[in-house]
């Protein structure tokens, strides 16, 4: 079964990224207020995930977003999304976005094509 180029997880629910919707009334969307990390994924394993999540926690604390107690949810979201994306068959990027409105958005993206050298 072919996979869409991008899958997303919004608050733990996995779906094609194009079908994932955030309400326009969401405070993080309205104010442009949140934090994000982009993580390289090799064979279904996010590189330095612990370091990235630590940085996200630090950023949410600095902005007073109140996310420090939800690390376990993020770890579960990451595992569920990467499993849906093909597990060890997936090489690409994982973007994690946390908003002031309390949303957890994770998106998988394929690696951009590299140009051919003549």
Regions found by a protein language model. Name each.
Residues 1-118:
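Conserved alpha/beta cores of soluble small-molecule-handling proteins
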